[in-house]
Amino acid sequence: MLEVVLQVLSISAITTTIALFFCGIPICMQIRRQGAVGDISGVPFLMGVLGGSFWLRYGLLKMDYVMIIVNVVGVACMAFYCVFFLIYSLPKKTFTCQLILVTSTIGGMVLWIALKPNLDYLGVICMTFNIMNFGAPLAGLGVVLKNREVSTLPLPMCVANFLVSSQWCLYGNLVSDIYIIIPNGIGMFLAIVQLALFVVLPIRENEKSPLEKLASWFTGRDSKVKDLERGDCIVSSPPSSPQKVPNETRSDVEDKFDKLMAETSSTIPSDSRRGSMGSPPSYKSRSSSDPDLSSIQSP
């Protein structure tokens, strides 16, 4: 039964680890769109080549075919990513020096194991490099904390690190290899720290982090803001107190009346004013042709 579990876990670890190696493809595509590496760090690729080469030599020395298959694919992928990163890096001097240093270290290790093979010494070195490899994405942690966003931290690689390290930690327990258990246990912890950054920090600037979005959803604050943007929520203003009309005195009313009469009299012609108001009305005497109204009696 244990052999079946080990075989299934070996296939699963090989599959997920190779999938981890392909997580560098989105990073390379982002570099190509930008035309330069920008703030993206090439340390994960360098550590992938370095750690993969040491683990490959460890697997060959131990004759562990699971580790041999995984690390052959891993070294090939990471070497391709390093060449791609070198093409787009400006200036190239820094990354070139780092690449030469990594290559020299691998060459020294191969020569040392060929002259004096020691599985324990090599296991300790592999364990150290593996821990550094899991923490390699933290090299860009300074940029993440400075910008307060995690766009430069590769999420697929962090997730894959967590899955792979947990499987290899279980694999190390089954094969009783302390050099596999310790680094992958630490790798699980580092992966959890990296994933926690994606929860507390936003992906891009001027955006909310997933934790803030969850808090807004629980409190309902986000829905209130959307209602205000749509104009659904109308805030009623308190009723305004009626304006008080100032009290007018009797003299003010008389002044307004005199002014109104003066304006009215100015619009009437002088002849009309004189005929209508100055002289009494004239009456015409009755002529003989006019009818005598006195003869008309009332009924």
UniProtKB/Swiss-Prot annotation:
Q: Where is the MtN3/slv domain?
A: 7-91, 121-205
Question: Where does it localize?
Answer: Golgi apparatus membrane; Cell membrane
**One matching Pfam family:** MtN3_slv
InterPro entries tied to this protein: SWEET (IPR047664), SWEET_rpt (IPR004316)
Low complexity bias locations:
276-299
Ranges of compositional bias, category Basic and acidic residues: 247-261
Report the Gene3D superfamilies cross-referenced here: 1.20.1280.290
UniProt superkingdom? Eukaryota
- Give a Gene Ontology cellular component term annotated to this protein: Golgi apparatus
Q: How does it sit in the membrane?
A: Multi-pass membrane protein
Segments passing through the bilayer: 8-28, 36-56, 67-87, 95-115, 124-144, 155-175, 180-200
Q: List GO BP terms, alphabetically.
A: carbohydrate transport
Give one GO term, molecular function aspect.
Answer: sugar transmembrane transporter activity
Q: Where is this region: Disordered?
A: 230-299
Q: What keyword terms does UniProt attach to this protein?
A: Cell membrane, Golgi apparatus, Membrane, Repeat, Sugar transport, Transmembrane, Transmembrane helix, Transport
- Role, per record: Mediates both low-affinity uptake and efflux of sugar across the membrane.
UniProt similarity note: Belongs to the SWEET sugar transporter family.
Name listed for the protein in its UniProt record: Sugar transporter SWEET1
Q: Which gene encodes it?
A: swt-1
